[in-house]
Amino acid sequence: MRVTFYTLGCKVNQNETGALAQLFEENGYTVVSNEEGADVYIVNSCTVTNFGDQKSRKWLRRAKRENPGAVTVLTGCYPQAFPDEAAEIAEADVVTGSGNRHAILTDVQKVLNGEEERVVDIRPHEKGERFEELPMDKFAEHTRAFVKVEDGCNRRCAYCVIPRARGPVRSRDEASVLEELCRLADAGYKEVVLTAISLPSYGTDSGTSLVELIEKAAEVPGIERIRLGSLDPDMLHDDDIRRMAAVKKLCPQFHLSLQSGCDKTLRAMRRPYTTAQYADIAAKLRAAFGADNVSFTTDVIVGFPGETEDDFEASMAFVTGMRFLKVHVFPYSRREGTAAYDFADQLPEHEKETRSRRMTAAVEEVRAAEAAAMQGRKASVLLETPLSATMFTGYTKQYLPVLVSAPGHKTGDIVEVTLGAWDGKRCRAEIV
């Protein structure tokens, strides 16, 4: 039996798809690419935006059109957040949510064996439920491993449907995380990324903390780099920063979730910080890790309900002033079930798209300038994608993309380089 996966959304989704692929392989399935014909098509959905829902439906229709006899599966955040809507999608033979992922295998088998014509198995998340273990030790990149350590979110930001899609905070057992890190190190992975739905919430439900986990992860032999997923700035405290700076394996690249650079919009979004507080946290991280050593990335929403042209200009001024190395810009997507869905002053789609283009152009200028400022500096690069026998792409600790000629080296090696010119996509570099 052949199975293929189509994944939308965040690194957590990608991690879960990898774990599901491993589960199916261990039960006799062959995982194939989307271009190949399969007996089972699985869509791991994202519902952050309406566009994500549309893409999930489109891919299911395509799968049924190309292979009418195949079993199609819709799983993840979309059915969890909107179960009635997802259950009505005729092209999906199996519909499951963001929990109880192990049951997908059984549900698929029921349809394949003719025991059930269709299975809808969306279970609501409950307070007190435990983190669902989905072990994974094989990654497509073969160099960087993503390790899921937490699920769920207890916040209620006005624009966000994720708490509805993912349920409450559930932390993975620390021993389980460390065991997986040991397996990954034994398999040759040198860099791990700790991922989660709400990473700073790790341990808040189990009496530990993210910083403790980072410190213990750094003790795993063979793991040379630890990178963090998205962080909420208000959940980083002075002692956390001090302890993190003492962990030499921790990459000094921080994805600090911003969403808007306008205080009025942040209040409307129900984000629990101001731009001044955000800038203060960033300044403390720069001081702790070294201003020339640290980098920041973030997410920004434009076109939120009530955002005026002045608000947008204020947001753009703050965002460009922060000198982010990379910014993911999103036009606001109106999601049913969120507070902002009912807000007045919804902006027209064309205005949101225009602001998205303007913000993107501005942050790309900053990205190029920040990369150019690094020219001549020394950096360590993890070699990831071979373009030829000697040419590789990879990333510095600061997550700067690099192109380097490295004869005698292989994927997964960490090499010391001197950074050169920025070509619009990456820095060219030379081995020291």
Task: State each model region's role.
Residues M1-Y202, D239, M244, L250, ...:
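Proteins enriched for Cys/Gly/acidic motifs involved in redox and nucleic-acid/cofactor modification
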Residues R2, N67-P68, V220-R227:
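Short, surface-exposed connector motifs at secondary-structure boundaries
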Residues T47-G52, Y189-K216, V220, D232-D239, ...:
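Conserved glycine-rich "GG(E/T)P / GGGxP" loop and the immediately following alpha-helix
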Residues C160-G167, R225-D234, S260-R270, A291-D311, ...:
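Conserved strand-turn element in the central/C-terminal portion of the radical SAM core barrel
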Residues D186, V211-E212, K216-V220, R225, ...:
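Radical SAM/AdoMet-radical enzyme domain recognition
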Residues L256, D299, V319, V327, ...:
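Hydrophobic, well-ordered secondary-structure elements that form the walls
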Residues E307, M322-F324:
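Contiguous mid-protein beta-loop-alpha structural module that forms a pocket-lining wall or clamp
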Residues D342-V432:
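Terminal RNA-binding accessory module
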